[in-house]
Design a protein with these regions (language model features):
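N-terminal beta1-alpha1 ligand-phosphate binding loop
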Residues: 1-21
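Anionic-ligand binding patches
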Residues: 3-4, 39-174
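A local structural micro-motif
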Residues: 23-24, 144
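A short, surface-exposed loop/turn module that caps and links secondary-structure elements
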Residues: 34-38
Length: 174
């Protein structure tokens, strides 16, 4: 029996390695299109379940771990930015305000499915255009929900966190 992380996220890989040293990585490619009618909590759980199901279909006896993370700002679900302009739009919208982060965790083995939805709240300082442009220039924004990674350069944007830090990173291990 193998443990499979259904993610290509280096952050999730690093955090799982603290818990288990021997696991496989098999990213799940699923359609992450956000529909206008999607509720944030339902959407993020549906994505994590879809990723777990896709990998579990090929590995029914193994343990499959999948996660999905979204940022929600004033009711808008912010997934990964499509380009730098979208990243700028997201960071500008988050600047000086409070937003929510939801990470859904799904663990599947055979017919057994365990799920968790872990919320957190993040307050950003007011960001200058120069700060946003410098961060975008680093490239860190590109593969992250809400266009930022709290464990990187964007940690300087954070005024306050309420909830699970690791949920914001994308893998709630606490």
């Amino acid at each position: 029996m193998a443990i499979i992380l259904a993610s290509q996220s280096p952050r999730r890989k690093e955090l799982l390695r603290y818990l288990v040293t021997d696991f496989l990585i098999e990213p799940a490619d699923v359609d992450e299109t956000i529909q206008p009618s999607d509720e944030p909590e339902d959407y993020v759980m549906r994505m994590a379940q879809a990723k777990a199901a896709k990998i579990a279909a090929h590995h029914p006896a193994d343990i499959v771990i999948a996660c999905d993370t979204i940022v929600v700002n004033q009711g808008e679900i912010l997934g990964k930015p499509v380009d730098r302009k979208d990243g700028y739009r997201m960071l500008r919208a988050l600047s000086g305000g409070v937003h929510q982060v939801f990470t859904a965790l799904v663990i599947r083995q055979g017919g057994q499915i365990t799920t968790a939805l872990v919320p957190a709240e993040v307050t950003f300082f007011e960001l200058t255009d120069e700060e946003i442009q410098n961060y975008l220039e680093s490239g860190e924004y590109a593969d992250k929900a809400g266009a930022y990674g709290i464990q990187g350069g964007a940690s300087l944007f954070v005024k306050q966190i309420v909830g699970d830090y690791y949920s914001i990173v994308g893998f709630p291990v606490g």
